[in-house]
Amino acid sequence: TGFNFATYNDWTKSVQRKYEAKYGRIKTTYMTSDKVPAHYCIGPARVVDVTHRVGTTDPKSWPASPAIRVEDVQAHEKLYGPIKAGEVVIFHSGHTDAHFREYQRGVEDPNTAAPLNGHTEGWPAPTPETINYVIDKGVKCIATDGPSMGSVNPEEAVMTHWAAASREVPFVEFLTNAGSLPASGGFFIF
């Protein structure tokens, strides 16, 4: 309501058709970033270690991001117990800690530009299925230490963002030092 999908360009409309065929109709919301309830971004932290995904894409497929899958979250749950409603899920890949550098004019940024340009592997990014899995558990905020929750692949990125936006769940991106938090028992405030 209030959003006109007809304003999307042809590429986005094509991705929208694929998304809706697989996941159902995209829902609209009036929850812009200024209207996200503060309590959504505060809660017990569950840090899902996905560092094992780093280095798993074939350089011939770049730009590409390793996919964070439901199985990764389930493996975390086997070790630390089920994710509970109200927890904040943080995906720890180590990407930003490893690649963030002070900007240098004329030098390709290794954190964001190089992966987007296909010169290095992208940051690990959750699939829409993974997003839906943690939201189904009652999670109201999802965070990552990557530059974006979405993959370096534009189609995958849009679908991941639509999965959360359709369910009014905000993302927090570009975290640093996520690996210094315990897998369970920490607390997140954004």
Kindly give the residue locations of the regions a language model identified:
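Active-/binding-site microenvironments in catalytic and ligand-binding cores
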Residues: T1-F190
